[in-house]
């Protein structure tokens, strides 16, 4: 296969390498492992294990294969890994499959580099885990490793539209993309008309396009130009419909293009300096697939991650993503580590050190539970982190008819300040626990939330702790009330003195989204994005500037009126 592929790549590169308007090269298309597990792949996996475990006894011990007579006494007797009942082995095979993607893309990039000019880039359209649309971190690729061979990261982001449009997927998947090279990225595919339920309302295509750029993308490219007439993507509609005629989507794309001809030089290469980050980990994602939550299935890891990322998004707190392979988190005031199910001790010690030296850590149930091979740590949970978190647990279950209530008055105060309820009698921060619950005993930690249930009322559902020069917030469960989660986060961030967002009681909240950054001219841009059909008026807080689209002067304190699905961009 590689031999034939190389012939094709070289012929193509010879054909286009001198064409002046070829600006870069996309290596492949949404390349993933796709469950590859043929005889050759399995033989390569055994070679990979031999390299990592020269002594087969060490391999058997690390993966617990003596249990249930799974022991492998000779590498030549290694069984078909598909269908194994040993989740550690299954997870290691997933890791190996991801490494094949990294090697394959790097192999292609090496060939392309023999031909490309210095002014041309190499990219790849990474996609994301999927339900009916892009939802979060990709399980079949280690995108941080795979992107090393590229000069710019690329992404395909698809999301709900019309009544279901929130912009959250544009942000979370865009933030993953921006984090891969710690730089701007390219949207190589996103929806025009898209799937039948996605047909955008007037104004939404433009709002989506500006949202991508506000997040740090340097492009918006649509899949695809015209709708196709046969086969599986016949109803994945492009800019043009099947009749090739102008339509509402096409005309709105023309508006976007004409605006960017005028102001694009002000928008490109937007840089951000966020003060909070969310950690991503492929091994934990796999772990949550092998040992799932109650209802989320294979999407459990991204469900927990999105619980936090979407809360930050609604609160207009911009955030970065970082890889779990990093060990220096000192550039961030606060670090969110969701569902770190699989973690080497080096990472847990780095998190402990981060807090001890003044960082503020937010983490969740099942973090620090198992090592890098999904072997459960045999001591107090959470392993290593129990001291910095100031708590421990030894039992957990799926919550049924278990309510969550605040313990601390500052959580209720944060909710009352930030969320307007015309009928105060209906205002409640009670919520239902879901997916997983740990029975937390606080040692030095202080309960923030508790379980309202006669069997569990003595246990904390969430707790905070002071440790060294920093602090921690731990969630032992999930719950369904967004306002409760946002209130807990706001209260904690207030206490830490967080400077990376507006935490005031009158701070704008979703559906009004605000994004900021520094452009190529060193000027600050402030994007106002209205994710609602209803018009809204927002007060501009910041230096005096110019609204770029309308060329209107803006003074601090001015009201900016946005129509339904409207956009404004102020340069200061």
Set out the residue ranges of the language-model regions.
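Carbohydrate-binding surfaces of carbohydrate-active enzymes
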Residues: 75-78, 106, 118, 147, ...
């Amino acid at each position: 296969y590689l031999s034939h592929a190389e012939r094709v790549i070289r012929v193509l590169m010879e054909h286009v390498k001198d064409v002046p308007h070829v600006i870069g090269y996309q290596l492949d298309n949404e390349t993933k492992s796709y469950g590859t597990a043929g005889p050759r792949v399995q033989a390569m996996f055994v070679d990979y294990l031999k390299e990592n475990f020269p002594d087969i006894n060490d391999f058997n011990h690390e993966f617990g294969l003596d249990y249930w007579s799974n022991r492998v006494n000779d590498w030549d007797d290694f069984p078909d890994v598909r269908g194994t009942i040993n989740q550690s082995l299954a997870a290691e095979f997933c890791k190996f499959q991801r490494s094949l993607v990294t090697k394959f893309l790097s192999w292609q990039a090496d060939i392309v580099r023999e031909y490309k000019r210095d002014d041309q880039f190499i990219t790849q359209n990474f996609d994301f885990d999927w339900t009916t649309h892009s939802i979060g971190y990709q399980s079949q690729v280690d995108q941080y490793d795979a992107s090393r061979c590229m000069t710019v990261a690329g992404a395909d982001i698809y999301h709900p539209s019309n009544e279901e449009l929130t912009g959250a997927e544009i942000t979370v998947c865009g933030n993953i993309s921006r984090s891969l090279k710690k730089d701007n990225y390219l949207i190589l595919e996103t929806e025009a008309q898209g799937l039948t339920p996605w047909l955008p309302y007037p104004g939404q295509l433009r709002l989506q396009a500006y949202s991508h750029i506000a997040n740090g993308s340097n492009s918006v490219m649509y899949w695809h130009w015209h709708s196709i007439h046969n086969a599986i993507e016949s109803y994945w509609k492009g800019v043009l419909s099947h009749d090739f005629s102008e339509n509402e989507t096409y005309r709105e794309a023309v508006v976007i293009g004409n605006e960017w001809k005028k102001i694009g030089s002000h928008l490109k290469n937007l840089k951000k300096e966020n003060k909070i980050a969310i950690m991503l980990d492929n091994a934990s994602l796999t772990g949550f697939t092998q040992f799932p939550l109650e209802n989320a299935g294979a999407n459990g890891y991204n469900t927990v991650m999105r619980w936090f990322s979407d809360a930050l998004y609604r609160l207009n707190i911009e955030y970065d993503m970082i890889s779990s392979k990093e060990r220096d988190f000192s550039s961030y005031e606060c670090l969110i580590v969701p569902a770190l199910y699989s973690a080497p001790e080096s990472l847990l010690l780095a998190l402990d050190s981060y807090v001890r030296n003044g960082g503020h850590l937010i983490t969740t149930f099942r973090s620090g539970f198992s090592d890098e091979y999904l072997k459960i740590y045999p001591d107090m949970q959470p392993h290593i982190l129990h001291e910095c978190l100031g708590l421990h647990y030894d039992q957990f279950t799926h919550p049924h008819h278990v309510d969550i209530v605040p313990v601390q008055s500052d959580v209720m105060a944060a909710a009352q300040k930030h969320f307007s309820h015309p009928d105060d009698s209906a205002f409640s921060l009670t919520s239902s626990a879901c997916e997983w619950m740990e029975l937390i005993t606080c040692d030095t930690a202080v309960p923030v939330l508790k379980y309202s249930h006669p069997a569990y009322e003595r246990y904390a559902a969430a707790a905070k702790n002071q440790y060294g020069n920093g602090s921690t917030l731990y969630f032992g469960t999930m719950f369904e009330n967004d306002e409760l989660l946002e209130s807990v986060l706001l209260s904690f961030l207030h206490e830490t003195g967080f400077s990376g967002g507006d935490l005031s009681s009158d701070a704008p909240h979703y559906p009004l989204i605000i994004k900021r950054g520094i452009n190529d001219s060193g000027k600050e841009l402030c994007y106002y994005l209205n994710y609602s059909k209803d018009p809204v008026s927002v007060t501009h807080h910041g230096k005096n500037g110019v609204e770029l689209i309308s060329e209107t002067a803006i003074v601090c304190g001015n009201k900016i009126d946005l129509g339904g699905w409207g956009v404004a961009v102020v340069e200061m």
